[in-house]
Amino acid sequence: MAVIIQKGLVGLVGKDYYIRHLSIINPFLPVELTPKEREVLGTFMSFKGEVAEKDRFSTYFRKEVKEVLKLSDGGLSNHLKALKDKGAIKEELNGTITIASFLLPAERQQFYQFKIVEG
């Protein structure tokens, strides 16, 4: 008989919601993200509002991420390059950077379902 494991995570706010989401789906990605890459991307994902939707990776938001995560300019650039190389983010024709759609969770609540099969 199959055992169904259900667990809810409640009370995650801001970047913690997005970092946890990335941690849950990470083993299923073609190329896994490091813990720091998940932290950087999750922080960018947490920004809300019209300005964030237009250019989430603008200088303003990069500065915010550097402050929150205590990163240097070079450190953030290295993580962004790694995220780009892994296909987590991409540069659009107009120069803006966007997050790969398969990484974006639903707002406020995300459900997951998967199964593993032996053999």
Label each region the model flagged:
Residues 66:
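The alpha-helix within a helix-turn-helix
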Residues 1-29:
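Long, low-complexity, charged/polar intrinsically disordered regions in eukaryotic proteins
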Residues 33-61:
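Short helix->loop/beta-hairpin flanking segments within DNA-binding domains
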Residues 81-97:
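A short, conserved structural fragment
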Residues 104-119:
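Short, amphipathic alpha-helical interaction segments positioned at domain boundaries
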Residues 70-85:
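Short amphipathic alpha-helical interaction segments
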